[in-house]
């Protein structure tokens, strides 16, 4: 009974057990061998286990194989000579001849003829006897030589009374013979597995026909110098399977292999059948197959895909064989799987862009030496193999950031400056929008400075209280508007060349002037934008649940909708002096405050200094958005929405806008799609490089703020892309011990569960993190410190996780959005459900996780960061 437990154990556990018994418990070792012989041949699954055990017991080395071959040859010769002598003696004595002859015939393998009735001479007996003695002497000499070889290679204790030389060499020979048999069987299976599959190309068994769509078009033809108009039916090309038995057989093979190529784990359950049907539908739409062909392919695939072929069964047998498992375990040990799990560290990066050497930037020595390196930490088991890094706070990165993020827009060695807007274009085309916002907002009060200070966390709060006291004694002056910039320490997905970004804050004294007016009135101003557009437009004020419902409602307004994403490359850099003045006109129109008007005027000309390493950088720029200003987010939304409203008004189209600053999506009717081809040239007049992304015609394919709509239990919700798993597995925070790591995992998990309840894959990932943290409790302040600003926006204060079942409908919707089919979703979820994420701090730099991004259909060049 005890030995039977080993059948289900790992190969490593079995090998360790055998080694321990052989060295210390010989009686158990021999009992185990007898038990193996008893179960051998009774059950095929047990035979594989028996072979694996005997392989571990043998532990054969190369030198033994040569000795075993020679020993087998010599032993055969001795046995043949002995049996022949025995036969001759029997014939001489005329007793036991039949038995002796049978023994001789067997030992000589039937290769030597010896008559039954003959009487050998004494001389013949002596010759055969001498030959046997000579062979025995040679065998003895061989055994002496073999014993010395064993002593040299394996030490004196290896050959002993429990493991004599002859038994060992016979075992080696048997194992080698079995290995040869296995090699022949493997070659046979390999030939079957790697035989080419005869799959014809789709075009060989289908044909294209033109069919009438039922619609008519007006055709103008010239006849006798006059134009004649008449209606003709609109034709459409469709593809169908040829009406022959050969074509249908070829189509059956083709669709079966095509679906299996997409997903080889499909079986006969409800979800698999739905997945098969969707794959067939997608293939049919791609190749424009007619409904009859689609129906036939669906029927074939539903029957053939879930039934494994003999090749599928053999493939699974090979993959799950004891030898294959043992080899994988050995590789796991060599890869240190289990030993390198935990929180790893990656060093910061240096931007690959060259220094342009712009004269506008002055670099001086003498500053206090500052830290350069910027490490990032990541969970080795869940980062999906996605490489995230943070920029080093180096002089090179600082110069690249200033040159490429403030002054120039090119990616090469030449200085290419941002486009300038046409004269007075903002006031000429967007004056009406400015006035509409002012009217919609109405009166806004100025809030107490103490309230502004108390809205920040402890560290900033003290600095704001100090600034408030300072303003009481020294009035605001222009120097308060000077900017002290620094490199933004953020996670960059390293899929392309990156220029680090800058944060450009002004003094706390300056922020109090603007913050007491603008910060607490921002929502009111954003709702005014919604009122001008006639529907919710600025979606940053809504959580991902409400965002999804709003976007779905916008989509459903159109009979044949299309979504056009708008990519505003480096928006802050393109905000010109003219754009800033237009934005400031809204604030001044609302508040009519001279102190705020003066502070806003100081945003036009920016004096900036920056400390990095032991250097100080100074530069001056007119216009441009300073990313640390109180009005950065709100101002970008006002400018973008104003330009978009004017553009839609100019086109005269009905459209819906989804905006979150520089991130925009336009939803309109497909008939209007071509009207937006001139968007780049239009926005170039305003000084912006605006590029339209590829239009999408399915709601689930609409991407907004790195999220897509997914129908969860019948209600649309904005769900982050699967690569967010890799991003949430990295942190810029310092981690000193395992308790810090568990706190980080708990904070990320709690927020992730709120956003992703009922979402395939993501819910399991965050449950895995939360479980691995030991369900650790963390403070609200720590949660805000861990999660990014974007995640906090999506939450909108939510902290309660409402458990939601994952339905088949939700799985199909997630598939439409992210390309991960329902069966793959379940496989990934099972992986996370069985995973415990280690909180051990590791010193290694890079490890390859078990679950990688390719399984989640994450493209290698799909980055969250713009250049």
Swiss-Prot record:
Name of the protein: Putative RNA-directed RNA polymerase
GO molecular function term, any single one: nucleotide binding
Catalytic activity of the protein: RNA(n) + a ribonucleoside 5'-triphosphate = RNA(n+1) + diphosphate
UniProt record, GO biological process: viral RNA genome replication; viral translational frameshifting
Family, as annotated: Belongs to the luteoviruses RNA polymerase family.
Domain RdRp catalytic intervals: 561-676
Function according to Swiss-Prot or TrEMBL: Probable polymerase.
One family name in Pfam for this protein: RdRP_3
Organism field: Barley yellow dwarf virus (isolate PAV)
Matching InterPro entries: DNA/RNA_pol_sf, Luteo_Rpol_P1-P2, Rev_trsase/Diguanyl_cyclase, RNA-dir_pol_PSvirus, RNA_pol_HCV
Signal peptide (residue range): none
